[in-house]
Structure formats: structure tokens, C-alpha cells
């Protein structure tokens, strides 16, 4: 699993049980040698030198760690592109026609369709709202970490049932409790 810094350099432990971080046991992978790999991706790495420290290049991305990114839309020329909140995602994402449902400055959830290290294509799957609004930023944080902002129907139904039967539930519970 490759770990990419904000500056774009990747590090990968020489072995699974090696300590994580920038230790001498890590293989250093320069940004131009990541070949489209992103932070957390499971990759195959080829060792290309060992002195003064191990250096390598990504041969193959085995599995993407993440396919959805919270982004902010900005205008480039006559089209909107999405810039990821995660500074380790190095390029703007071309969201094509899916940008029609949003406007410049909106926070959006983008599904990554392709990324080769220099160009990225994706599609907007959710417009979160205008950047800077408290509710929007809170939802963006939740989505960035892979959680949903929507509750499943069965949870919503249970919440409605509790609301309807609130008084009965309270009176039943009070009888079961003992004050000390």
C-alpha cells in the first residue's frame, strides 16, 4: 500500500511488517514514477535503485483505495473542473457534462472514472452545496471519510415510530428505573 505525501512523493514499506513512514526501509517513489497511483492504493512496485536509499516505480495498481472524492468546482476556461479537497490528489478532475447540475464554488462528491497520473475524468454523483456553508462543510467531511449523509429507510421509520410513541416509551421506562 503506497502512502503519498502532500508534495506528491510516495512511500511504500519494503515488507508488510516494516514500520510505516519515511524510514530507511521504505521505498521512495517520485511523483512521476507513481503512474497514477493515489494515497492508499494497493500497488506493485519495481525497485529501481537501492543507493542512497531504496527507490522504485509503480508497475501496476492492483486496487484503488478510494474512488470517490469531495471536490470544489472551479472554472477553467469555459468549463467547470473539480479540485479535490485531499491535497494528495494532484490534478483537477474533468467532470464533463455532469457539471451542469452544479455551479462554480459548489462542493461536490465526484466518482473517479479514470486517472493516469496526469489527467483525471470523473462524474458528479452528489452536489453537496455552496462551499463555506457550515452544513455543507460538515457533510463534506462526512463524505470525505466514506460515510453516507442519508439514513436507510428502516432507520427513518424507526425514528418516526419513536416520535409517535414518545410519551408511551417514556412512561414505560420510568416504571422500570430506580432512583438512588
Language-model features, listed with the residues they occupy:
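Charge-lined substrate channels and their catalytic hotspots, especially those that engage the 3′ end
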Residues: 1-180
Amino acid at each position: 500500500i503506497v502512502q503519498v505525501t502532500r508534495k506528491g512523493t510516495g512511500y511504500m514499506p519494503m515488507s508488510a511488517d516494516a514500520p510505516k513512514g519515511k524510514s530507511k526501509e521504505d521505498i521512495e517513489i517520485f511523483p512521476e514514477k507513481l503512474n497514477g497511483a493515489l494515497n492508499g492504493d494497493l500497488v506493485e512496485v519495481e525497485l529501481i535503485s537501492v543507493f542512497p536509499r531504496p527507490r522504485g516505480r509503480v508497475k501496476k495498481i492492483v486496487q484503488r483505495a478510494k474512488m470517490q472524492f469531495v471536490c470544489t468546482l472551479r472554472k477553467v476556461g469555459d468549463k467547470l473542473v473539480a479540485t479535490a479537497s485531499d491535497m494528495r490528489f494532484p490534478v483537477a478532475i474533468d467532470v464533463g457534462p455532469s457539471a451542469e447540475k452544479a455551479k462554480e464554488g459548489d462542493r461536490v462528491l465526484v466518482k473517479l472514472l479514470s486517472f493516469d497520473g496526469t489527467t483525471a475524468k470523473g462524474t458528479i454523483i452528489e452536489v453537496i452545496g455552496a462551499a463555506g456553508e457550515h452544513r455543507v462543510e460538515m457533510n463534506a467531511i462526512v463524505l470525505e471519510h466514506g460515510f453516507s449523509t442519508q439514513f436507510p429507510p428502516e432507520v427513518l421509520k424507526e425514528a418516526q415510530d419513536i416520535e409517535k410513541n414518545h410519551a408511551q416509551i417514556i412512561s414505560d421506562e420510568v416504571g422500570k428505573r430506580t432512583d438512588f
